[in-house]
Amino acid sequence: MASITLTPSEKDIQAFLEHYQTSLAPSKNPYIRYFLKLPQATVSIYTSGKILLQGEGAEKYASFFGYQAVEQTSGQNLPLIGTDEVGNGSYFGGLAVVAAFVTPDQHDFLRKLGVGDSKTLTDQKIRQIAPILKEKIQHQALLLSPSKYNEVIGNRYNAVSVKVALHNQAIYLLLQKGVQPEKIVIDAFTSAKNYDKYLAQETNRFSNPISLEEKAEGKYLAVAVSSVIARDLFLENLENLGRELGYQLPSGAGTASDKVASQILQAYGMQGLNFCAKLHFKNTEKAKKRLER
């Protein structure tokens, strides 16, 4: 029988209770605030703030709090470095890349914290747990600002080679701190052949072999940690850039980005967009066309 213990926020607890209020049941245990009988699982919410989920459906209900079961592979049970990036698909904001070093004895702590791929967690949950991860987990975070991104793209780098450079540098700097991984995993964003081709132009190199794996954030907690910290760094940068310009900058590259981009273009010109956006995205031309209407 699966058993999962979590310590979520009171706000998340209340949201869970509201969602499953019809499953509330009495409990004689004086230390249990709420007890729920759900299909294939029971949930005990203790006065201490801890939550115990038991049963075949425990993982399903734990995912409400951001818990993600990580695939148990032989590689997962090694001290390893995992890397991930956030921001490459967003017009506004910089490009954040993080390398994190995780050891097997940290796995329980990370799962109880609710660590998972940043794409499966709410921004609120990410902002809540990222500071804890930054304090407890050895990592190296890099942020390429939009203006610097625009400076290097089209000159020395393209959209793929710049990510190779950042992932390589994050790993290199983390290794310089003395960590000793038995494996290094990168959440694959290109082929190994392409990665090696672009890596050849980088100065800082290391001898450790690397593995590029698709959906690595669901297989390795080190990659999941990097995903969360990178998302937090990206969101913080997005907020700071927007604050300086007086606009709320949306994430992504949809029509909302086109609209805000046209407003910034009208107010500040191309200099304003260069400050906060990745200019080679199609959103730039769409923003210009909006002003021509």
UniProtKB/Swiss-Prot annotation:
Q: Record's InterPro entries?
A: RNase_HII/HIII, RNase_HII/HIII_dom, RNase_HIII, RNase_HIII_N, RNaseH-like_sf, RNaseH_sf, TBP_dom_sf
Q: What class of enzyme is it?
A: hydrolase
Question: Which residues take part in binding a divalent metal cation?
Answer: 84-85, 187
Q: Which GO terms describe its cellular component?
A: cytoplasm; ribonuclease H2 complex
Q: Which cofactor does it need?
A: Mn(2+); Mg(2+)
Task: Give the UniProt subcellular location, in the record's own words.
Answer: Cytoplasm
* GO-annotated molecular function: magnesium ion binding; RNA binding; RNA-DNA hybrid ribonuclease activity
Which CDD domains would you find in this protein's record?
RNase_HII_bacteria_HIII_like (cd06590), RNAse_HIII_N (cd14796)
Q: How is the cofactor bound?
A: Manganese or magnesium. Binds 1 divalent metal ion per monomer in the absence of substrate. May bind a second metal ion after substrate binding.
Keywords annotated in UniProt: Cytoplasm, Endonuclease, Hydrolase, Magnesium, Metal-binding, Nuclease
UniProt-listed Pfam families = DUF3378, RNase_HII
- Catalysed reactions, semicolon-separated: Endonucleolytic cleavage to 5'-phosphomonoester
Q: Which domain of life is it from?
A: Bacteria
Q: Which PROSITE patterns match?
A: RNASE_H_2
Its function?
Answer: Endonuclease that specifically degrades the RNA of RNA-DNA hybrids.
Q: What is this protein called?
A: Ribonuclease HIII
Name of the coding gene: rnhC
